[in-house]
Amino acid sequence: ASIIHPTSIVGPNDFKPGLPMQAFVDMANGKRKLMPNWGYNFIDVRDLCDAAISAVENGKTGQNYIIGGDYHMYLYIGELIGEKLGRKVVYGALPEFITYLPLPFEYIRALITNKPRVLTLDAIHTAQTGNKVVPSSLAREELGHNPRPIEETIYDTIEFFQKRGLVK
């Protein structure tokens, strides 16, 4: 068996949005007009599925594969969401120290609403210290991993959420 290690998984057909996807929904609905000045390496779930199938069919036994896309800033993701919706949804970057202030309130909100926290200390730490260059070259070479452009992922994702009524 081969082992795959995806980066931050995003994309359409997410019927119960997790942390990154809920952030996209919130941006689209105007709930997050300012975003932190950081990002993540995002991988489209459809590309991850293709890589997983290829790992079963072509992967080397015991080999680990990093399945990543490209690093993108949340500000850019907000621009893409705005393009898809035909309106501006993100207006600028938050100073880094301010990102810590809502943590206790986010925790309480999650307890009351029984919904996952969109912002966690771990998410802040990962975004601040995470490697912006994630090497997926082995997966590209041995599994034929070829992630689609983030623009396609975001447009398809927002369209999916619109159809589900999560994005107005």
Region locations from a protein language model:
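Mid/C-terminal beta-alpha module of Rossmann-like enzyme folds, strongest
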Residues: 51-118, 136, 149-168
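Short aromatic/basic micro-patch
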Residues: 3, 39-42, 71, 133
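Conserved beta-loop-beta element that borders a ligand/cofactor-binding pocket
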Residues: 1-12
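Internal helix-turn-beta structural module
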Residues: 131-135, 144, 149
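Short beta-loop-alpha junction of Rossmann-like oxidoreductase domains
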Residues: 12-14, 19
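A conserved pocket-lining segment of Rossmann-fold NAD(P)-dependent short-chain dehydrogenase/reductase
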Residues: 23-43, 47
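Low-complexity, charge- and small-residue-enriched intrinsically disordered regions
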Residues: 33-41, 105-131
